[in-house]
Amino acid sequence: LMLCLPLMGMAKEKNDNTDPKYLAGAITMTDGKVTFSKDFNVPGASKSVLYSTMKKWADGRFQPNEKMNARVVYENETEGTIAVMGEEYLVFSSTALSLDRTRIYYALTINVKDGQCDMTMNRIKYWYDEARNGGERYTAEEWITDDMALNKKRTKLAPICGKFRRETIDLKDQL
């Protein structure tokens, strides 16, 4: 029983629909599109060092395989730009009898210059329940915004859209 307690704590965290991290204001919009941006200051790091570090990370993280087509689609060391098309699964829940997940597609743009790395994630789309009659497709704008993914009081995540929002924010934080 004592061995299960840490696992129960982790499960509760994953399903905590009132965590402020996921509530109002967690989704940023740019020109009507869901966009996540993060700027990293790396004092003393040259553009070439940052570029090679980020290029190595992107090449390792985004590799196509027989099921997914994630890949680096553009690179220009002179500009300091790397563009990636991401494709992976977001797993909402997994048990021996069921698997609830969605495929997420997104664009990730990395721009580097001396001492700074800027990352932008946008053009986010989902393909949910793909094995059942072709599944359903959604864009982030119609599925994870405050209006769709939060309750009316904006104090907790909505039952269905909320899981997409939570997992998308967690993916953004991982990147």
Residue ranges, per PLM feature:
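Hydrophobic h-region of N-terminal signal peptides that target proteins for export
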Residues: M2-M10
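Ser/Thr-rich, low-complexity intrinsically disordered terminal regions
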Residues: M10-L175
